[in-house]
Amino acid sequence: MGHSAVLLCVALAILPACVTGAPVQRQHKLLLVSFDGFRWNYDQDVDTPNLDSMAQEGVKAQYMTPAFVTMTSPCHFTLVTGKYIENHGVVHNMFYNTTSTVRLPYHATLGIQRWWDNGSIPIWITAQRQGLKTGSFFYPGGNVTYQGEAVTMSRKEGVLHNYKNETEWRGNVDTVMKWFLEEDVSLVTLYFGEPDSTGHKYGPESQERKDMVKQVDRTVGYLRDSIKRHHLSDSLNLIITSDHGMTTVNKKASDLVEFHKFSNFTFQDIQFELLDYGPIGMLIPKEGMLEKVYSVLKDAHPRLHVYKKEDFPKNFHYANNPRITPLLMYSDLGYVIHGRVNVQFNNGEHGFNNQDMDMKTIFRAVGPSFKAGLEVEPFESVHVYELMCQLLGIVPEPNDGNPGILRPMLRSGSASLLSSQHHLVALLVGILTCLAKVL
């Protein structure tokens, strides 16, 4: 047997023990809470004493920039994979198949394994492979399997789930506390569908949205009281964040982006369409019709930006994925795309350019690993995954985040930095990569 083959056998023998063996010493658990659609400044026109005290006792970001496209499932998956959307593949809230033209709504898509399990490994599975137990409560992507592995503890919301029930919210918090205490879970992701639902229905500037933010704040207070009541304050780090913001929909008739009214455009030229979902649109023209459809649409409306897939702005980190169609488009802030008929009537919407301030969201963190009274500069949500891996002391999967971006918010010595065991894992992976090229 040659030297390369011997090294390969040794590396393959050692690597599983390093990855799946006893983890480095960890003292702290982690709870990631997402309040869907919580715009970065929602706490500025409402009294939020619990979020305020959390900032005083922990870390607050001026705001957090979500990934593009600013939709619920794609942005939530970025948080737990550390990847831009074009790299993790959950490119839309809706499952779609361009061959069969099947399109499934948001709730149905939550249970479609192949939509989520497409090559990226979320933090639940990474942590479990390194000896930890994890949980997901209503968090998008948390109730399917990845490479055959399921999250240790999981709950999935029903199709007709009432997002607004504050009593249920407290019950969900109680369940999560039991997971930490009775099931020895180290990581839980907890999802609430508000204030997104209220923002959609009534608009982000409405009194109803303001009232819902007060409910969110009361729930934050209940959560922090529960942590203290269960004596977890010294062993549990808490992160509260969101997926995206919200903006008011422009409903002025003369400004509507309506495909069925565009001159020289016909759906007879289209093989597949994904429209009528906020400001994002995807089209597959019929064979030989790409240039014609593109030329008709590219200047069809001053608020609509239409691109060939290969020309879509690279800074969005969105179009370079097999699931993205040959024609891709988005509209300006406040303008939604109507297809064959007008079926969108929300007063609030998201999905827009992630550089628009209305799409920015919140980040708060408190616990034994975080500094107190620190406000940090804005950052991208893609970096949160690396932070969570540091807090849990686990080796991250390959990702697009930078582990140094958020490290300054941690107390000195509190981050579970890579141990010698983790360096050995990296070394062995490097050996395997090199050997694969010569064998």
From Swiss-Prot:
- Residues the entry annotates as binding Zn(2+) 1: 36, 72, 243-244
The protein's required cofactor(s) are namely: Zn(2+)
The annotated phenotype of a deletion mutant is: Mutant mice are born at the expected Mendelian rate, are viable and fertile, are grown normally without obvious abnormalities. Mice shown signs of hypertrophy of the intestinal epithelium, as the widths of the villi and crypts, as well as the thickness of muscle layer under the crypts appear increased. However, no spontaneous tumorigenesis either in the small intestine or in the colon is identifiedknockout mice up to the age of 10 months.
Report the top EC class in one word.
hydrolase
EC identifiers of the protein: 3.1.4.12
Ordered alphabetically, the record's keywords are:
Cell membrane, Glycoprotein, Hydrolase, Lipid metabolism, Membrane, Metal-binding, Signal, Transmembrane, Transmembrane helix, Zinc
Q: What are the transmembrane regions?
A: 415-435
Q: Please give the superkingdom of this protein's source.
A: Eukaryota
Which ranges of this chain reside in the Extracellular compartment per its record? 22-414
One record GO biological process: positive regulation of sphingomyelin catabolic process
Report the Pfam families cross-referenced here.
Phosphodiest
Which positions are annotated as binding substrate? 93
Q: Which PANTHER family match?
A: ECTONUCLEOTIDE PYROPHOSPHATASE/PHOSPHODIESTERASE (PTHR10151), ECTONUCLEOTIDE PYROPHOSPHATASE_PHOSPHODIESTERASE FAMILY MEMBER 7 (PTHR10151:SF63)
Protein name according to UniProt: Ectonucleotide pyrophosphatase/phosphodiesterase family member 7
- The protein's organism comes out as Mus musculus (Mouse)
